[in-house]
Amino acid sequence: MPVLPWLAAAATTPVRRSPPLPATPRALLRLPASSFPPWSNCAKSGLPPRGPFATAADTPLGGSLPEPEEERDTLLDGALRAARFRDEESRRPDPLFIDPYAAVLLSLDVASEDKDLLALHLMPSAEHYRLVTRYIDDKLQHFISNSDDLRQIVLLTDGMDTRPYRLSWPRLSVVYDVSPRRVFITASQQLRGAGAKISRNCVVLHTSSESPDLQAGLNKNGFNGNRPSLWVLQGLPLFTFKSLEDLLLVIGNLAMKGSIFIGEVPRFTQWGAATDMASEQDRLENLFFTQGFRVSFVHYEEVAKDVGLGLDSPPEIHGRAIFIAEQLRFSDAQMESFRMHFERIEDDADEDGFEEL
């Protein structure tokens, strides 16, 4: 796979086991799919063709990506808040993207959690969320449309990512959704009840982000480290810098050389206000490089300019960063293939030498 061009230079200035779901049923706000016009930037026209519904793998539970105890009950609410952002954007006169499924995911009581979520900085502002979503949508569609080999897509999400439903996908695409299991199940049930279907061109497989061995879970679902892959990070609960390190270790082991990783790094509470953006990005760049990735960071202002918008104000996005990275290192699967190949060569040489004797 050829080396892909870099879309942005490095920025130097700001730019366990989960508890069961609540027993109380949530009221849904159903939204007809015909309420929105097609979005030409991501899909040809209308909604994606109807096809088989996403299938979830039987993955083990556990906790390779640890989360603080006090944050556990916010996962579902955080995913719902993101869905509300997408629904609100879809209703704008000139939206950056269309998500006709977001309203199906909403519950009437999600607004009561907004203040706490903002105080915890678990999500960016609505303005920045919409920009990041548009940026990721565009780049994802660009990469899969311009490569005949890029058919493994890993979405690292909050469990309510609707990209498998609302974006167009090439034939034989396999989308691996890595997210909190209980949130993913809740979203899948709601979408299924509303009649949402995934394109016939792709299949969606779920791997729990709470799996004790995320790498083994993805391999169990059929992920192939000898084939190119595209990784997308938006919404996956990462509460500490260590959790990001663990995630990058897994991706570095799985991603074939030349694979692409795009997304947004969340804010980590241990990064105090005294830490400036440049030093944070230096630390992130070193972390990516340790796992074999060459990374560039993208200013939020640049994304806004590219879509013809201006940020009303520079909100508190301290510690958040949009990135695009390329894997320069061989995956574990590639290294194993090389090892087996050289072993066969050595065995053949030994047999030839024995015959000569």
Curated annotation (Swiss-Prot):
GO cellular component annotations of the record: chloroplast
Keywords, sorted A to Z: Chloroplast, Melatonin biosynthesis, Methyltransferase, Plastid, S-adenosyl-L-methionine, Transferase, Transit peptide
Expression tissues: Expressed in roots, leaf sheaths, flag leaves and panicles.
Superkingdom as given in the UniProt entry: Eukaryota
Compartments in which it is found: Plastid, Chloroplast
Region (Disordered): 50-71
Pfam families, sorted: LCM
Transit peptide: 1-53
GO terms assigned for molecular function: acetylserotonin O-methyltransferase activity
Matching InterPro entries: Ppm1/Ppm2/Tcmp, SAM-dependent_MTases_sf
Pathway assignment: Aromatic compound metabolism; melatonin biosynthesis; melatonin from serotonin: step 1/2
PANTHER family for the chain: S-ADENOSYL-L-METHIONINE-DEPENDENT METHYLTRANSFERASE YKTD-RELATED, S-ADENOSYL-L-METHIONINE-DEPENDENT METHYLTRANSFERASES SUPERFAMILY PROTEIN
Family membership: Belongs to the methyltransferase superfamily. LCMT family.
Function: Involved in melatonin biosynthesis. Can function as acetylserotonin O-methyltransferase. Catalyzes the transfer of a methyl group onto N-acetylserotonin, producing melatonin (N-acetyl-5-methoxytryptamine). Involved in the regulation of jasmonate- and brassinosteroid-mediated plant growth and defense responses.
Additional note from the record: Overexpression of MTS1 in transgenic lines enhances grain yield.
Name of the protein this chain belongs to: O-methyltransferase 1, chloroplastic
Organism whose genome encodes this protein: Oryza sativa subsp. japonica (Rice)
Gene: MTS1
